[in-house]
Amino acid sequence: MTNPATSIASIQADHAVKLLAPLTDLVIKAGEAILAVSRKSLQVQGKADGSPVTEADLAADRIISEGLARIDPAIPVVSEERAEQSQPPFSGSFFLIDPLDGTKEFIAGRGEFTVNLALVSEGIPLLGIVSAPAIGLLWRGVVGRGADRRAIKGAGAEAPTPIRTRPLPIRGLPWNAAVSRSHGDPATEAFIASRPGAVRKMLGSAVKFCRVAEGDADIYPRLSPTCEWDIAAGHAVLTAAGGRVTDSKGAEIRFGQARPDFIIPEFIAWGDPTAIP
């Protein structure tokens, strides 16, 4: 089968900005569908990799996939829930989505799960939207055009507020490290321990990227494997807000490059790019 992405031209920032409003509406709609699923009758199934999936994941995936087909049917879509149907490597542009990031948080009744949607262009996330429907916040950004946060709960919600990363505190002062509530690992702990003065902020899902993007945390390291759809949207939001995402050696991370199972071996999300080694 021919990979349809090979014929899709790269989308630039001007086009991405035009897509931002309809994509935002779509992500909000997917979040509403997740909240409509009753946890009392929630049925949890296991994927081949052992991770959980629920009817909320599938409902959000269906809404986003159908919406993207209406908004721009020429752009290929890679979704966590249908990853086996995708054929990387991808040239040009493609959508990369995680319909429910933090399924464990959702199952446990915690609010830090998100809907993640990214537009990747030439291997780099260009546009990102991260919605946390249970806590009523949405973050979004287009690289080179800035990032913002908005409330999405209530009848009118609020206008978007621009966000920006903050400089890393000077040596000797406390700094905030966003760390996973559900996926701790020895390498990440060693990285944080090697930089004295860290205050750990335990968070779930892609909310960690967004807290760095809005200047509430300084760094988000994860030195263990995760998947491209887990980080692409947060990557774009953080980069648009002034940060960067690299591997532990400071190298750029590229997406859609035919890594097995879309695995990202490691990454560090930096609020202050001057801190990158």
Language-model regions: role of each:
Residues 1-25, 32, 190-193, 209-277:
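Oxyanion/phosphate-interacting regions
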Residues 43, 76, 176, 198-199, ...:
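Conserved beta-strand segments of alpha/beta enzyme cores
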